[in-house]
C-alpha cells in the first residue's frame, strides 16, 4: 500500500465501502489523463460518474483527512513525476439539460465545454457559449479559471469571460454544505475565482443564454477554431498544458518570451513551441522536471533581459523532483515536428508507457 500518512487500514476499508471496492484503484499513472501527457501515479484513483458520486468522494476524503485532488480534463496543470500522495478524483459527471424556453443550459461540472456543452446550446439556438470553442475545459474548470476568449471576428476588441453567461452554480462548500450560489459569489477576475482561495467543489452550473442563429454561431466557432489553429499547437501531436505564464497587463507574456529569442528552447523533452512562445510542448518523454527547469530558465532570461517577472499560470500538482539540470538548447523551427510514432504513443498509451518501451 502506498505510504499515506493519514490512511489507516480502517480508513481504506471506509473508502472502499463508500466508493466501491472495484472502482477505487491504486497506483494509477496520471500522464494519460492530462493534456501535457506528464505525471507520475496517484496512490488512489476514483472516477466520479455523477455529481452525487463526486460529492460523496470529496466528503469521505475530507472526513478521513486523506489528501485529494480533483482532476477534470487535465489542462492547465503540471503533475509531478512523483505523482500524487493521496486520492485523485477524476470528474466525469457530465449530464447536460437544455431548457430552451428559459434560455438556459444546466450541466454537471465534469461536462466538457467543447464540444458537448457548446454543441448542445448551439443546437438549441442558444447563444453565448460559442466563443469558447476549442478551449480544453470542463464546466468546473471553466468556473475555476473564469474561462475567456476574444470577442467574435472581425473586431476581436475585448475579452469575453464565462462569468458573463453564468447564472448560478451548485457547490459542495469547504464547510461541507450543499449550496446554490450566484455569479457574484465567485469574485471572478482574469484567470481567477474564489475557487483558488476556497476549497469549494463545483457540482453543476446553469448558464443564461440568448436566442441566436445557429448558422451565425457556427461561423463564429469556425473562425475561432481557425484563429487558435494558426497560433497554438494542436494537443495531438504536441501535448501541452496551454499558456504557461499569466499575461502582464498591457503586454503579452508570449511577446516578452519571443523578444528574448526563446522560441524553440528545449530542456530534455520540454520545448517552447515555435507556434506560440507562451506554450511549452512535450516533444516526447518530457518529465515534469524538464518542464520546471524550462519554466525557471525562461523566467530568468525574461527577468534579466526585460525586467518583467513572469508568473506561472499553470497549477503544479503532486510530488516534484528537482528541476532537470540539462543544458537548454535551441531547436530550429523545421525540426519542431512530432513523428507519427510519437503521436500514436501520446494518443494511445501516454508518456509512462513510452518510457516502459
Residue ranges and their predicted role:
Residues 1, 349-356:
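Short, low-complexity, charge-dense intrinsically disordered segments
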Residues 2-5, 346:
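Eukaryotic N-terminal low-complexity, Ser/Thr- and Lys/Arg-rich leader segments
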Residues 4-145, 149, 356:
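Anion-binding (especially nucleotide phosphate/pyrophosphate-binding) glycine-rich loop
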Residues 25-26, 32-35, 77, 172-296, ...:
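Phosphate/pyrophosphate- and phosphate-bearing ligand-binding catalytic cores of soluble enzymes
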Residues 43, 152-155, 283-288:
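Glycine-rich tight-turn/loop motif centered on a GG-T
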Residues 78-224, 256-258, 264:
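C-terminal structural segment of proteins
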Amino acid at each position: 500500500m502506498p505510504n499515506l500518512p493519514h490512511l489507516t487500514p480502517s480508513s481504506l476499508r471506509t473508502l472502499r465501502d463508500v466508493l466501491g471496492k472495484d472502482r477505487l484503484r491504486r497506483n494509477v499513472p496520471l500522464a494519460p489523463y492530462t493534456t501535457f501527457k506528464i505525471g507520475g501515479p496517484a496512490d488512489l484513483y476514483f472516477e466520479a460518474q455523477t455529481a452525487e458520486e463526486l460529492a460523496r468522494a470529496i466528503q469521505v476524503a475530507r472526513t478521513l483527512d486523506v489528501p485529494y485532488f480533483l482532476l477534470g480534463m487535465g489542462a492547465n496543470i503540471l503533475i509531478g513525476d512523483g505523482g500524487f500522495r493521496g486520492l485523485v478524483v477524476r470528474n466525469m459527471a457530465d449530464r447536460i439539460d437544455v431548457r430552451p424556453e428559459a434560455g438556459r443550459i444546466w450541466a454537471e461540472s465534469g461536462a466538457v465545454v467543447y464540444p458537448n456543452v457548446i454543441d448542445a446550446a448551439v443546437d438549441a439556438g442558444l447563444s453565448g457559449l460559442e466563443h469558447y470553442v476549442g478551449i480544453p475545459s470542463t464546466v468546473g474548470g471553466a468556473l475555476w479559471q473564469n474561462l475567456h476568449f476574444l470577442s467574435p471576428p472581425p473586431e476581436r476588441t475585448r475579452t469575453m469571460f464565462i462569468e458573463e453567461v453564468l447564472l448560478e452554480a451548485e457547490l459542495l462548500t469547504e464547510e461541507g454544505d450543499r449550496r446554490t450560489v450566484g455569479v457574484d459569489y465567485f469574485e471572478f477576475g482574469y484567470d481567477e475565482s474564489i475557487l483558488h482561495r476556497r476549497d469549494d467543489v463545483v457540482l453543476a452550473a446553469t448558464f443564461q443564454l440568448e436566442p441566436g442563429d445557429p448558422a451565425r454561431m457556427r461561423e463564429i466557432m469556425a473562425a475561432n477554431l481557425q484563429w487558435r489553429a494558426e497560433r497554438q499547437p494542436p494537443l495531438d501531436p504536441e501535448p501541452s498544458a496551454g499558456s504557461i505564464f499569466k499575461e502582464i497587463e498591457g503586454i503579452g507574456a508570449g511577446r516578452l518570451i519571443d523578444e528574448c529569442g526563446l522560441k524553440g528552447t528545449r530542456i530534455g523533452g520540454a520545448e517552447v513551441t515555435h507556434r506560440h512562445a507562451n506554450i511549452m510542448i512535450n516533444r516526447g518523454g518530457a518529465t515534469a522536471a524538464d518542464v520546471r527547469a524550462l519554466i525557471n530558465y525562461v523566467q530568468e532570461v525574461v527577468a534579466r533581459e526585460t525586467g518583467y517577472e513572469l508568473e506561472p499560470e499553470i497549477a503544479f500538482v503532486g510530488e516534484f523532483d528537482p528541476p532537470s539540470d540539462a543544458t537548454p538548447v535551441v531547436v530550429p523551427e523545421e525540426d519542431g515536428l512530432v513523428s507519427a510514432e510519437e503521436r500514436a504513443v501520446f494518443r494511445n498509451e501516454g508518456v509512462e508507457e513510452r518510457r516502459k518501451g
